[in-house]
Amino acid sequence: MALTISRAQYVATYGPTVGDKVRLGDTNLWATIEQDLLTKGDECKFGGGKSVRDGMAQSGTATRDNPNVLDFVITNVMIIDARLGIIKADIGIRDGRIVGIGQAGNPDTMDNVTPNMIIGASTEVHNGVHLIATAGGIDTHIHFICPQQAQHAIESGVTTLIGGGTGPADGTHATTCTPGAWYMEHMFQAAEALPVNVGFFGKGNCSTLDPLREQIEAGALGLKIHEDWGATPAVIDSALKVADEMDIQVAIHTDTLNESGFLEDTMKAIDGRVIHTFHTEGAGGGHAPDIIKAAMYSNVLPASTNPTRPFTKNTIDEHLDMLMVCHHLDKRVPEDVAFADSRIRPETIAAEDILHDMGVFSIMSSDSQAMGRIGEVVIRTWQTADKMKMQRGELGNEGNDNFRIKRYIAKYTINPAIAHGIAEHIGSLEVGKIADIVLWKPMFFGVKPEVVIKKGFISYAKMGDPNASIPTPQPVFYRPMYGAQGLATAQTAVFFVSQAAEKADIRAKFGLHKETIAVKGCRNVGKKDLVHNDVTPNITVDAERYEVRVDGELITCEPVDSVPLGQRYFLF
């Protein structure tokens, strides 16, 4: 006999369903559930008097020898994902990977159970009611200056760090390069202790090929070209030749001073080959004043770093001070001051907001401790989305913010994964991928996750007093969980390396315990492959006034005095 309950009662018990709108934090963004994969009346819920019990929603006979039995299931959760959309489902995990998005349960007693989502006695359950699940974030612009960055990253919902460095050396303060085989080995060994996935860039600044090849063979998943080492046409060509040969990505911070050529010369050196441009607006560095034009090319994968996101009344002043420190400039030297002033342009920063909203800029990253904040990639992405809704109105005619939400979440999940040849493994919650999952309460979305799951094991979470009688008494703050302890760290995070390094078995050579996964397909991608962010309009920049035009139309916006997801979330 069917039981009819009110929509309000259903939402209170099982969470929102199709058509329900959920506000993201204190932004003005509302996500509407597009599809519900659960069977009404057969929802799985754990707890006293609930349905996940032996013989009910939990099988009384299925053992883990059955490959369809889950290790971990998140039930009744709202999913926000660039590829899956905004849906309601159970998430099934086995052996550290997502094996099902659908209906979990006991097929002996329930209809429509997804075939490989059986709940058994060996299954752990987490209630996803009133939570939002997203894929772990990917930050592709990491200066590995200190190991403590990883903690701040994972606490913000970022689970993969890609970049370079060797610690607080001046070369690392300024550039994201791990130079040479010796440092590559030692940085992999050091990163064994980090609770996040890691990939390292080699130093791409070399006009001959062998010094680049040896870094790729030692484990670098890509090469980074930086102007501080000389971003010349010869260097660019050499790095891209090695990239094409060894199937890795090249990231570039172009020549702010235009010493060895202008943007047109850099694009000529790139010669149509795919490349990942960092801080493509230019405040973080790059051809002044028109590096932003690079975003119009189909072979360019354009990224932002987060300090310019979004454009606020404090953005300009903050950048001048940051720049002087990060690039070892002296306020007493006129040439250094001129260098700094040439990079910080309100006009192009304002345009960057709009280019993100149009889907022209495709990736968001941090520039950690080197003119960017590792813990604010997610926050600033959603602050930008909210500002653009306020200033530009709705995108599309859906009557909700779903398209804008999917466009923006793609910028720090699936698109950086595509750019670096790791989308087969991370970047979305699709079946088959590593179960790096972030769970949020809607009111804290984008700011403070409830739980961060790494490879199917809870690694970080909000946790109260460990001596309390229940988990919730204050002080509540982020603490490492069992997935980030002891030998488990090596089982819950991976290293992304080149195919050459995988073939050379650097895991055994360096004595590593974490799984190494080779990147692939880095040279076959283009702007067209970047999800919801593949637009390639004509962009022009006025060389004197710095005004930016897209297809002939001036694009600009005002800085704001305040942003959501701000101080009210950080009083304690």
Swiss-Prot record:
GO terms for cellular component: cytoplasm. Its cofactor is Ni cation. It comes from the Bacteria. The active site is at H327. The modification N6-carboxylysine is found at K224. It catalyses: urea + 2 H2O + H(+) = hydrogencarbonate + 2 NH4(+). It is found in: Cytoplasm. Residues 136-572 form the Urease domain. Its main location: cytoplasm. Transmembrane segments: none annotated. Binds 2 nickel ions per subunit. InterPro entries: Amidohydro-rel, Metal-dep_hydrolase_composite, Metal_Hydrolase, Urease_alpha_N_dom, Urease_alpha_subunit, Urease_AS, Urease_asu, Urease_asu_c. Its EC number is 3.5.1.5. One of its GO terms (biological process) is urea catabolic process. GO terms for molecular function: nickel cation binding; urease activity. Ni(2+) 1 binds at H141, H143, K224, D367. Keywords: Cytoplasm, Hydrolase, Metal-binding, Nickel. Substrate binds at H226. Ni(2+) 2 binds at K224, H253, H279. Pfam families: Amidohydro_1, Urease_alpha. Pathway: Nitrogen metabolism; urea degradation; CO(2) and NH(3) from urea (urease route): step 1/1. It is an enzyme of class 3 (hydrolase). Belongs to the metallo-dependent hydrolases superfamily. Urease alpha subunit family. Heterotrimer of UreA (gamma), UreB (beta) and UreC (alpha) subunits. Three heterotrimers associate to form the active enzyme. This is Urease subunit alpha. The gene is ureC.
